[in-house]
Structures are given as C-alpha cells and as structure tokens.
Amino acid sequence: METLESELTCPICLELFEDPLLLPCAHSLCFNCAHRILVSHCATNEPVESINAFQCPTCRHVITLSQRGLDGLKRNVTLQNIIDRFQKASVSGPNSPSETRRERAFDANTMSSAEKVLCQFCDQDPAQDAVKTCVTCEVSYCDECLKATHPNKKPFTGHRLIEPIPDSHIRGLMCLEHEDEKVNMYCVTDDQLICALCKLVGRHRDHQVAALSERYDKLKQNLESNLTNLIKRNTELETLLAKLIQTCQHVEVNASRQEAKLTEECDLLIEIIQQRRQIIGTKIKEGKVIRLRKLAQQIANCKQCLERSASLISQAEHSLKENDHARFLQTAKNITERVSMATASSQVLIPEINLNDTFDTFALDFSREKKLLECLDYLTAPNPPAIREELCTASYDTITVHWTSEDEFSVVSYELQYTIFTGQANVVNVACDGTCLLGSAGLCNSADSWMIVPNIKQNHYTVHGLQSGTKYIFTVKAINQAGSRSSEPGKLKTNSQPFRLDPKSAHRKLKVSHDNLTVERDESSSKKSHAPERFAGQGSYGVAGNVFIDSGRHYWEVVTSGSTWYAIGLAYRSAPKHEWIGKNAASWALCRCHNHWAVRHDGKETPIAPAPHLRRVGVLLDYDNGSIAFYDALSSVHLHTFHAALAQPVCPTFTVWNKCLTIVTGLPIPDHLDCTEQRP
C-alpha cells in the first residue's frame, strides 16, 4: 500500500493528488499546486492570468498554457478515480495513508511537554484545558468540546486522538520564505528545511534535496551514534570523576596519616631529646656534687691547716720574745721543726686546689645534631649510586663491583643488575632508562638477559660464574621506602682463562721452568718417561698448555726472548704429537724460521710480514665465533686471523727450536681488541 501511495502522491504537496491535472508531458499535478506555482511566478500586482507557462516539477518540461490558463489543461480523471478507490479501500483510521503520513510528522513531537495546552474550540474565556488532541483535525479539545465534536459515529471514529500537544507541534514547521507553506523537504546543499515552492521556483531549485524521512533517518542515526559516544564518554568521565573523588579521599586519608606520623616522629625525637637532656643533666649534677664534695674537703683541709698554722705562729712569736738564751734554745728547735713541717704540708695542699674548673669534660657540642634537625624532611628516593670502576677487581670468572652512595644512611638496600655487553647501543638504552634495564633490539633481546642480585647491604658485591674474557654492563640501584634510583652503567670485564705449560707434554729436549711459564731448548735435559700426551719425533719440539678451552674469548701473550725459530698456536687433543703444529687439520700456528714468517694450517703455509723485531706475540681466541687471531702485542698490529668451525676443545701449543718462550696468561682482552676483531 505504501508503494502505491507513493505513486499517487503529488510531487509538490506530497499529499494524495487532489483534482489532478494531466500535463502534456504525461505527469500529473494537483490543481491547487499548479496554481501556487503560477502565483510564485507573478510579480507584485501582476494577475495570475498573465503567466502562460511553467515547468513540470517532475521532468522540468515547459508547459505552455492556453488563454484559459489551468482550466485549459485536461483533468486526469483516471488518476482521480484510482485515488478515490484507494481511499475507500484503505480503512479510515490509524492505519490510513493520510493518518500514517501525519503520524510520521508527529512522531518527533508526541513527547510530553510541560507547556499548558488549551482547548481551541471553547467559547469560554479563558478556555479550558485540553484533554485530547485530534491528529486528524489538527485541533485540541477540552472534554466537553470533544464530546460535542467527536461523537462515537463514523467518520469521527477514525480520527486519531492523542494526549494534548501545542498547536505548533500539530501543524508542523512553516517555510521561512513561503509563510503559508509547510516544510516538506530538506535542502542538502544549504542544510536547511524548505517547502516545495522553494525547490520549484525559489533559490533552492538547483540544489540537491532529500525527503524529510530520508534526512530524518540519516540525522537520527548520526545523532544516536553521537549520543552513544557522548554517553560512553560521560560514563568514562563519571568513572574518572569517581576515581578522582576516591583519590581525593585517599589524599585526605594519606595526608592525615602522614601528619599523624609526623607528629609521632617529632614526639619521639622530642622524647629522645628530653631523655638525653635528663641523662646529661644527671651526669652534670653528679659531676657537680663530686667536685663540690672535693672542694669542701679541700676547704676543710685549708681551714684546719690555717688553724694549726695560727697556733704555731703564736707559739713562734712568743718564743721570739724570749730573751733568755737558754730558754730560747730549749723551745726554738721544736718550734722550728713544727714550722718547717707546717710549711711543707701547706705546699703539698696548694697544688691540689683547682680554681679554674669549668666542667670541660662536660662540654656540649650539638652542631651536627642541629644540622640534622634543620634537614628534617619527608623521605625521598636516594640519589643514584656511582660505580667506582677503579676499585673494581676481576678474575677469569668473577668480578667484584664497588660503588659509593651520597645517601648511604637513607638506603635500605642495593640491587645489582648485570648482563653481557653487546654494543654501545645497549649502554645508551640502559642509561636513559631509569630503572628498567632493556637493551636495544638485536643487542640485548629482553629483560630476561639481565641478572639481578637483590637485597645487598654492603657497598660491594662479587659476582661468580662469569664467562672469561667477556665484558659486562653493571648498574646498581639504591632502594628505600620512597623509591629507587639507578646508577650510570659501568663496563667491567673478566680476565682470560689463566693456564701454565704442562711439563708432561714437553718434548724430551725441552725444559719447562719459571713456575711452568717458560719453555727452552735443552739438549742436556734428563731422560723423561714416555707419555701419550708428550710431543715426540724428530724436530717436533713442542709443549702444550694445561687447559682445553671449549667456549668464550681468551687472550694471552708470548714473549719470544730472542728466539728466531718457534711456532705459536692451538691444537685439538687429537692432533698428532710427532708433527709440527699447523702441519695437520687439527692445529693452527704462527711460525718463524729465522727471517721467514708464515701462518700454517693443514699443511698450507701463508707468508706474512710482521715487524722485523717482533718480541711479543698476542693470541686472541674466540671459540664461539671460530676465530684465532695473532697480533704484535707491543704495537697492536694485526698479523693474521684463522676462521674455523671449532668442533673440539683446543689447547694452547708452543714449539721452540732455539732459546726460549715465556707465556703471560690470565690477561684481560685489550680494549682495542674487545670492541671489534681486526680483520686482515
């Protein structure tokens, strides 16, 4: 029915055709709508009859009128009959086409309103309040007027009654440019409600327009979407507001707790000060009592001495008045002895008296405590500690890290973190990261590669089980209740694996000495027992180290001590003991035979040209990467590098035909070799 209704709807008024005219272009138009089009083309005070043409609103075909005007056009009787039958077939009531159109127009306005609605049919003054609004009549009625105008008979039984709404809601919006026309379409170009005349003859005729229902659905969907987002945002804001309010409450509670804690701590300090005041005051009082008691005794002694002296002085003066020599001599000797004794006793008494006792032993100096009290403040995270690389020590598998802290008294514990150094990039990354230690991609894969030693109480720690000849990054975190801060990273490295020469492997014509660090040619050496590991054979004057290396990076040096015929290298355990090193696939060697220098492996020699007076050879073994490199240890000049997929543990091996060689092992890898291995 709705599809048929749309075919029977006038393109101007959007209602069912009323007295339709059949245009020459085969389209139809309501007579009144056609008349309004002519009126819109008239100038001021110009009669409608003067207009003799207009455009079809559907196809834009120009319709030329005769002298009779619109009356000269034929009536579309067939269309009118179809409309009449359609109206009869449609039950008049809420489901009728006209009512359906009105309902769609009123749906947005049927919400309850606080505006008071008066009866529009009342003769009373003032009018009574309306109880119903008839959508069909577009009028609001009071109870009496409703009964009078809408008896329970046809056709009034088909009228739709709703709760009273204002008249403006019933009649809908009117066009701003054509006051007698309702808006019935939407100009998309100007984003404005318009009427049919605006589209036909107004400034919107070339604009894109849309049906109100279409625009209504689109804008409603958009509004619903925006409303959903707004509601969601409001929900988030309400959640945030609740959290903020909760945070405010927590701030109040925590601040009150901290204030109470501050009062408690200050009361404890005051109590401690009062206790110390009482203790020190008691000591001062006790010292005063002791000193006064001693002084009182000294006063009594002085008085007693004075009394005896006064009596003695009186007797002496009386004796001096005696003129009889015999009597004077009889008493003078005794008095003289007593005077001498009294003088001596007073001399002994005087040094005991201290007239300048100022209680120096009870001197008070609270300057340090005053400074501490002046610095009283809430606890903060300790300052970052500093790693003292100059104090750190290392062996081939341990590193002892030392650090200092400015806030040593506020630090509860330290946390040591370390990992293998893989490049400068992960140092920068660690330094920029406050507490989380993660290396750059491809350098330090994850936080799992960092080892953590927690709860350290001292300012030093020894890490065991490290790889030899390897550089590590260390950082120290100082921790207390307020937080933690990490030190700048420090780079420390373990030494190479130390080893010595194995005398059991030395050729019979070689002597190992100097704590198994030197090997020399010795034709007069004593007989040595045969052993499977001993070098033998004509000219195979070799000796092996006492270690087999199967991982890591290691560096050692060989002092040639004036020898001009020797070989320095490495060999598998399976390498033949009767061949020169480098003559087989199981050994690699740098060789010198007087003025001829070469490197040798699997019987193949490659000449090299080192400095004429090479006195110290450096050997760098990187087992995991399969490289054996030789250097001039004094000038750091690279001589040669073997690249091999090492499949077995290798042993340092040495051959000497004249003079001696001395090894220096357990060295850290030099810095210029530690970053990148030199290539030939």
UniProtKB/Swiss-Prot annotation:
<comment type="subunit">
    <text>Homodimer or heterodimer with MID2. Interacts with IGBP1.</text>
</comment>
<dbReference type="GO" id="GO:0015630">
    <property type="term" value="C:microtubule cytoskeleton"/>
</dbReference>
<dbReference type="Pfam" id="PF22586">
    <property type="entry name" value="ANCHR-like_BBOX"/>
</dbReference>
<feature type="binding site">
    <location>
        <position position="142"/>
    </location>
    <ligand>
        <name>Zn(2+) 1</name>
    </ligand>
</feature>
<dbReference type="InterPro" id="IPR003961">
    <property type="entry name" value="FN3_dom"/>
</dbReference>
<dbReference type="InterPro" id="IPR000315">
    <property type="entry name" value="Znf_B-box"/>
</dbReference>
<feature type="region of interest" description="Disordered">
    <location>
        <begin position="516"/>
        <end position="535"/>
    </location>
</feature>
<dbReference type="GO" id="GO:0008270">
    <property type="term" value="F:zinc ion binding"/>
</dbReference>
<dbReference type="Pfam" id="PF00041">
    <property type="entry name" value="fn3"/>
</dbReference>
<comment type="similarity">
    <text>Belongs to the TRIM/RBCC family.</text>
</comment>
<dbReference type="Pfam" id="PF18568">
    <property type="entry name" value="COS"/>
</dbReference>
<feature type="modified residue" description="Phosphoserine">
    <location>
        <position position="524"/>
    </location>
</feature>
<feature type="binding site">
    <location>
        <position position="145"/>
    </location>
    <ligand>
        <name>Zn(2+) 1</name>
    </ligand>
</feature>
<dbReference type="GO" id="GO:0005881">
    <property type="term" value="C:cytoplasmic microtubule"/>
</dbReference>
<keyword id="KW-0862">Zinc</keyword>
<feature type="binding site">
    <location>
        <position position="204"/>
    </location>
    <ligand>
        <name>Zn(2+) 3</name>
    </ligand>
</feature>
<dbReference type="InterPro" id="IPR017907">
    <property type="entry name" value="Znf_RING_CS"/>
</dbReference>
<feature type="binding site">
    <location>
        <position position="198"/>
    </location>
    <ligand>
        <name>Zn(2+) 3</name>
    </ligand>
</feature>
<feature type="domain" description="COS">
    <location>
        <begin position="320"/>
        <end position="379"/>
    </location>
</feature>
<dbReference type="InterPro" id="IPR036116">
    <property type="entry name" value="FN3_sf"/>
</dbReference>
<feature type="modified residue" description="Phosphoserine">
    <location>
        <position position="96"/>
    </location>
</feature>
<feature type="region of interest" description="Disordered">
    <location>
        <begin position="484"/>
        <end position="503"/>
    </location>
</feature>
<keyword id="KW-0479">Metal-binding</keyword>
<dbReference type="InterPro" id="IPR003879">
    <property type="entry name" value="Butyrophylin_SPRY"/>
</dbReference>
<keyword id="KW-0597">Phosphoprotein</keyword>
<feature type="coiled-coil region">
    <location>
        <begin position="205"/>
        <end position="264"/>
    </location>
</feature>
<feature type="zinc finger region" description="RING-type">
    <location>
        <begin position="10"/>
        <end position="60"/>
    </location>
</feature>
<dbReference type="GO" id="GO:0032874">
    <property type="term" value="P:positive regulation of stress-activated MAPK cascade"/>
</dbReference>
<dbReference type="GO" id="GO:0007026">
    <property type="term" value="P:negative regulation of microtubule depolymerization"/>
</dbReference>
<feature type="modified residue" description="Phosphoserine">
    <location>
        <position position="92"/>
    </location>
</feature>
<feature type="domain" description="B30.2/SPRY">
    <location>
        <begin position="495"/>
        <end position="672"/>
    </location>
</feature>
<dbReference type="GO" id="GO:0042803">
    <property type="term" value="F:protein homodimerization activity"/>
</dbReference>
<dbReference type="InterPro" id="IPR017903">
    <property type="entry name" value="COS_domain"/>
</dbReference>
<feature type="compositionally biased region" description="Basic and acidic residues">
    <location>
        <begin position="516"/>
        <end position="533"/>
    </location>
</feature>
<dbReference type="InterPro" id="IPR001841">
    <property type="entry name" value="Znf_RING"/>
</dbReference>
<dbReference type="Pfam" id="PF00622">
    <property type="entry name" value="SPRY"/>
</dbReference>
<comment type="function">
    <text>Has E3 ubiquitin ligase activity towards IGBP1, promoting its monoubiquitination, which results in deprotection of the catalytic subunit of protein phosphatase PP2A, and its subsequent degradation by polyubiquitination.</text>
</comment>
<dbReference type="InterPro" id="IPR003649">
    <property type="entry name" value="Bbox_C"/>
</dbReference>
<feature type="binding site">
    <location>
        <position position="150"/>
    </location>
    <ligand>
        <name>Zn(2+) 2</name>
    </ligand>
</feature>
<keyword id="KW-0833">Ubl conjugation pathway</keyword>
<dbReference type="Pfam" id="PF00643">
    <property type="entry name" value="zf-B_box"/>
</dbReference>
<feature type="zinc finger region" description="B box-type 1">
    <location>
        <begin position="116"/>
        <end position="165"/>
    </location>
</feature>
